[in-house]
Amino acid sequence: MAQTLSFNGRRRVRKFFGKIPEVAEMPNLIEVQKASYDQFLMVDEPEGGRPDEGLQTVFKSVFPITDFSGASMLEFVSYEFEPPKFDVDECRQRDLTYAAPLKVTLRLIVFDIDEDTGARSIKDIKEQSVYMGDMPLMTNNGTFIVNGTERVIVSQMHRSPGVFFDHDKGKSHSSGKLLFAARVIPYRGSWLDIEFDAKDIVHARIDRRRKIPVTSLLMALGMDGEEILSTFYSKSDYKRDGKGWRVPFQAETLKGSKTLVDMVDADSGEVVVEAGKKLTPRLLRQLQDKGLKALKATDEDLYGNYLAEDIVNFATGEIYLEAGDEIDEKTLPIILDAGFEEIPVLGIDHINVGAYIRNTLAADKNENRQDALFDIYRVMRPGEPPTMDSAEAMFNSLFFDSERYDLSAVGRVKMNMRLDLEVADTVRVLRKEDILAVVKMLVELRDGKGEIDDIDNLGNRRVRSVGELMENQYRLGLLRMERAIKERMSSIEIDTVMPQDLINAKPAAAAVREFFGSSQLSQFMDQVNPLSEITHKRRLSALGPGGLTRERAGFEVRDVHPTHYGRICPIETPEGPNIGLINSLATFARVNKYGFIESPYRKIIDGVVTKDVIYLSAMEEAKYYVAQANAELNAEGKFVEEFVVCRHAGEVMLSPRDTINLMDVSPKQLVSVAAALIPFLENDDANRALMGSNMQRQAVPLLRAEAPFVGTGMEPIVARDSGAAIGARRGGVVDQVDATRIVIRATEDLDAGKSGVDIYRLQKFQRSNQNTCVNQRPLVAVGDILNKGDIIADGPSTDLGDLALGRNALVAFMPWNGYNYEDSILMSERIVSEDVFTSIHIEEFEVMARDTKLGPEEITRDIPNVSEEALRNLDEAGIVYIGAEVQPGDILVGKITPKGESPMTPEEKLLRAIFGEKASDVRDTSMRMPPGTFGTIVEVRVFNRHGVEKDERAMAIEREEIERLAKDRDDEQAILDRNVYGRLLDTLRGQVSIAGPKGFKKGVELNNAVISEYPRSQWWMFAVEDEKVQSELEALRGQYDESKSRLEQRFMDKVEKVQRGDEMPPGVMKMVKVFVAVKRKIQPGDKMAGRHGNKGVVSRIVPVEDMPFLEDGTHVDIVLNPLGVPSRMNVGQILETHLAWACAGMGRKIGQMLEDYQKHLDITELRTELVDLYASESHDEVARFDDESLLRLADQAKSGLSIATPVFDGAHESDVSEMLTRAGLHTSGQSVLYDGRTGETFDRKVTVGYMYMIKLNHLVDDKIHARSIGPYSLVTQQPLGGKAQFGGQRFGEMEVWALEAYGAAYTLQEMLTVKSDDVAGRTKVYEAIVRGDDTFEAGIPESFNVLVKEMRSLGLSVELENSKLETADTVNPLPDAAE
C-alpha cells in the first residue's frame, strides 16, 4: 500500500464526481493585476539593469530634456523606491494612501557652445537624486489603498493598434454597394483611414478630417505618377507585328475570365481558344505546355488600355501622352505617328484588376510632391498659409516621428501579420512600405481577393491592465512637467543650479492622484464577500477613457464571439445597459505580454494527447483543430471515436481524429470563477446562470458560514486566492494562537536575512467597503505542524478554507397558502431563532472638531441641555464606550460648537460688568445614531492634529496599541532566543574550550551540564579550539545581534508612528471614528437566492410547528414555489436538491457507523464504507488515510457529506440515483410530507432536499424608510427624495389619476399643496394641529410659482387676476375649453 496520509481536519475533503483529470494548474486568480503592476514598477529589478518596460520606458521616452538653445540637457539615470512610510493596515486606519516615495536620479549636463562653429563641448555634469512624488503600491491582494479605502483598477478591453480592413455593409450608398476601407490605428498618434467612395476612387483621411486622394498621400511620400502606377499594376508590352499587335501570353492575369473573341497564337496564327469560352486554370496550363508565348491583337484590343509609361519624344523632350492615359481612337494614331513600335500597357482588365488607383491618379488635382504636401497641410491646419518647410515638417510629424506617433510593439506585430511584412517590433512608426502595403491590400479586397477583419474577434481586441493604464497616465504627467522644465532651464542661470531646482514634481504626482482618485477605471472595490472581490479584480470593461460608451455600443460588440471560448466568460455579465460591455476573465485565461488573452491547451503528438500545456491567443488558435476537454480517450491517451467534435477557425465541426492538434485542458476553462461555482451549471438556462453568477457576488457573509454540501471543487481556490482564508507563508510549528493573531515558528526557508518567526495578525470585526463584516478565525492549535500553503485561519464567508456564501437549508417545493406566490419564500422560525441567516454589518460614523471663525469646536461630555440619561454611554472625554448598546437618537460623540453672539441689551451689559464673563454661547452638534439603526460599539478611533493635546481616551487607545506592539516584539524575541541559543548549544557541545566566562577553566570539553551553569547571555564568551566552529559561532553571534537590533528598530519605528500626531484635513483639530456592529436577523422583505438564479423575497416567517414535516418529525426550513422551475429552465436547482438530500442521508449513515465504532472500537466497516464512498478516478487519497485521520474525516462528514460536481463534468442523473439508494432514500427524491397545522399528509409526495441558499445584500432594514418632518428642496420647496436625504414619497402622475378616479378631491388637494410645496399652508396646518384645530386652507403651491417664473423668463407675460364673478342672475357661462 502507498504511503499513509494524515488528515488534520483543517480542510474539507470532497467526494469528487469529475471524470476528467486536471492536467494544468489553475493560474492564481488575481495574477492579472499583480503581474501587470509588478511589470510597471519593477521594484525588484536592479537599478542599472532594468529592461525598457513600464516606468523605465516612460522616463526614457520623456528624458533627455534639452533647453530651447541646446546649451544644457537633463538626462534620466535611474529610479528607486524608498520603503513606504505606513504599512497597509496603518493606511486603512488613518485614511492615507499606501504608497512609496519615488526617487529619480537625474544628470544635468551643461555645454559650451562655440559661437563660430556651433560645436558643443561638455562644460559641467551634475548628478542628483530628486523626489518625484509618491507612487501607490499594490497590496498582496491586488488592490490599492487610496485615502484609506480599497480600490481596484479594472482592466480595459480596447481595439488593438494595427491595421483593420472593413466595409460599410452597403449602408453608405443607396445602391447597396460595398465601400471598402482600411484604418491604421496607432497606440498614440494620428489615425490614417484609406477608403473607397461610390465612384471607386480611393481616398485617404488623417484623423477623420477632410479626405484627399490617396495618390496625393503617396506623392507626399515622394512617389511620382509613373512610380505609383508601376507599384500597383503589372506591365505588358504590345509590339507592332505587321498590321496587328503581338502581346505576351500571361496565364495568371487571364485566370477565370471569359474570351470575348477568338484567341490567336501570334506565331502560328492558329485559333487556340474560341470566343465565349471560360479560361480555367487547367486550360491555361495546357496552353502553357503547348508553348504558347504570345497572342495576336488588333487595334481594337488596344483601345481601353492605359499607358504604363510616358510617351516622350526624346529629341525634343515633348511629352505626347502621360502614364495612365487611356489608349483610344484619338490617342493611338498619335503614338503610331511618333514612330513607336512598342507600347507599354498597364495590366488592368477590369475583372481581376480594377483601375482604381489609375482613376484616382487621373482625378487627383495635385501634380507633384509640393502640391500634395500643401494640400495635406491645408487639411490639417486650415487657414494657415503653407510653406514647403512647415508642410514637410508637419507631414513627417504625423506618422514618422517617434515622439508623436507610436504603433507600439503590439501594433507592429499585428501589422506584420496582416500585411505579411517582416519588420522588427522596435520599429514603431509607419514606413512608406507600410502605407503602400495597406493600399495594395485594400485594392485587392475591392478586387475580391482576401477577407475583411472581424473587429469583435479577440485577436483584434486587447486588454490594458493596471500597469499599462498607469504608464499612460504617468507619461501625461511627465509631459506636462517637461514643458515647465524647458521653460525653467531657459530662464534660469544654468551654471549654478542642481537638477532639484529645475524639477517641480507636482504635475506628475497630480496625474497619479487623478488616475487613482477619479478615473472611470479606478473603482471602489466590491467587497461584499471574497468572491465579489476576486470577480472585481478579474473584470474586463470596454468602457472608460479611450473605450466605448454605453449609448454608442451596438449589438455586435456586446455579443458572445467564438473567440471568447476559454478567454472571456459567456455567462457572467451585468443585466442592464452594460450587458456585454463588462465581462469577466475565464478561469484558466491569462493575459500575454502584448495584452491578448490566452487560453491553455494540451498538445496532441502523433494522435496521443500529452500533458504538455501551451497557451495560445485567439489569433494563434485559429489555425488549429481543438478537441473539447470531455472527448473520450483510451488508456494510451488516444481518441476513442473515429470522428471527434472540435473547433476550428470559430466553427464547431466533426473532424477525423488524426487531424486534431490540440485539446482543451478542462471543461471549466470556458466560464468565469463565479459561474464555475454553480453546480449543475450545464442543466441551467444561460439567463438564469447569469443571474446566479451575479447574485453570488451579493451574498452577505453570515454569522456562521457553512460550506455547501454540493460544491464544484472551486471553493478552496477562491477562498485562498482572494486572501480571505489565510495560508501559511512557510512551513513551521504553531507557537501561539489567540483570536487576534497566530505565531508560527518557521522550520522551512530559514534565510540569514529572514526572521525565523511568522506573525499573522487576524482581522477582527473590521468594516468592508460595503459595510459587511470582515472577521478571521484561527483554525490551528498550539503545536500543530504546518506545511507551506496550509490554511491556518478562516475569513468572512469561508469554512475550513472553502468559500461558504450561504447555508444548506432543508427545502420543500410546494405551494403553501399563497405565501410563495411570485417567487416569495416561506421560512421557518427556527432559521431566525438559531441565527441561520443572521449577518453582522458594521457602520462607520465619523465626527470632526473644526476650528471655526467663532472659536474651536470641542469634543466633550459637557453638553448644554442634555440629560444625564442621554450621556450614559459616554466616557469623560465625551466618546462612547466600546461594548455599549446604542439605539436611534443615542449620542455617540458629544460635540459643542460656538454660536454667534447675539447683540446684548443694556441690562445684560450691566450684569456682565458686575458678574464677569458668562460662558460663551455654544450649541449641541453631537453625533447621534441615525433613525432605524440599533447596534453595539465595536471600535473607536481618535485622531489628533500635530501639537494638539491628546485627551484621556486617545491616550488609552495609544497605550493599548503600544502594549500590543511590545507583545509582538517580545514573542518574536523569545522565539529568536530559543532558536539561536538552541543552535549555540548544539554548536558548543563536544568542543574543547580555550576561553569562557569569568572563573571558567580552559581546555574543558563542553557539555550541557558545563554550559548550563552559566546564564544564557554569557554563553557567547566561550571560545573553542576548532577554528571552523569558532567562525561559525561568530557568524551566529553577528546574525543574532543583527536580528535583535532590526526587531528593536522596527518596534521603535512603529511606536513613534503611534505617538506622532495625525495628518488632518485643513481646519480639523480632532477626529473620532465610531464603528457600530449591527446584527441583522432574516425578516420578511429580505431578498434571498439559490445559486441558479432562483431569487425571491421572504414573505412570511412561520412558527416551526406550522411548517410541513417529514415522517421522522423533521420540519422543513423553507418552502419554495414549484412553478419557479419550469418556465425559468434552471433545473440545476432540482438536481442540487436531490444530491444534497442524498449527502445528508449519507451523513446520517456515517454518524450511525461512528457511534457503532465507539461501542465496538472496530474501524473496518467504517473504513470500507468511506474508502468506497470517496473512491474516484482522480481522487484516491482517502484509501491512504491512517485510522485517526479516517475518524476525523467521518466526524466531518456526519453532518452531511461534502461532494464536488465540477461544471460540465459533474454528476449525472444515474450518479444522483445511486447516491440516493446508497443513503437508503427513495430514488425519486420525493418524500411524504405532513401538514404542520392539521397533521394530515399532503395529497402527493413532495420534493424535499437541501438547497444552498444565500442572503443577498438587499436587506429590508436598509430600504425601509419613513419621514415625519424633513428637509425641502430650495427651488421647488418640495420634500427631497430618498432615504439618504430623509426624503418623502413621490406622489406621481399615476397616483394623482387614482385619486381623481375615486373623486377624492380634498385628499388630492392636500397631496398637491400642504403635504408638498405650499409653504404658507404647511406652516398654518402645523399651527392648527398645535391648537387642536383640524381645518386648513390650501394656498398656491410653490411649483406653480416656479412654472410662472420660467414662463416669464421665456418672455411670456403671465398675470394672476383675481376678478370677482358677477351676481348670480347675470353669470356669464364659462368659455368652453375647446374654444
UniProtKB/Swiss-Prot annotation:
A Pfam family reported for this protein in Swiss-Prot or TrEMBL: RNA_pol_Rpb2_7
EC number: 2.7.7.6
GO BP term (any one): DNA-templated transcription
Top-level taxon of origin: Bacteria
Keyword Nucleotidyltransferase: yes
Gene Ontology MF terms in the entry: DNA binding; DNA-directed RNA polymerase activity; ribonucleoside binding
InterPro entries in the record: DNA-dir_RNA_pol_bsu_ext_1_sf, DNA-dir_RNA_pol_bsu_external_1, DNA-dir_RNA_pol_su2, DNA-dir_RNAP_su2_dom, DNA-dir_RNAP_su2_hyb_sf, RNA_pol_bsu_bac, RNA_pol_bsu_CS, RNA_pol_bsu_protrusion
Catalyses which reaction(s): RNA(n) + a ribonucleoside 5'-triphosphate = RNA(n+1) + diphosphate
Enzyme class: transferase
GO CC annotations on file: DNA-directed RNA polymerase complex
UniProt function note: DNA-dependent RNA polymerase catalyzes the transcription of DNA into RNA using the four ribonucleoside triphosphates as substrates.
HAMAP family found in the cross-reference section: RNApol_bact_RpoB
Family listed: Belongs to the RNA polymerase beta chain family.
Subunit structure as annotated in this protein's UniProt entry: The RNAP catalytic core consists of 2 alpha, 1 beta, 1 beta' and 1 omega subunit. When a sigma factor is associated with the core the holoenzyme is formed, which can initiate transcription.
Name used for this protein in its record: DNA-directed RNA polymerase subunit beta
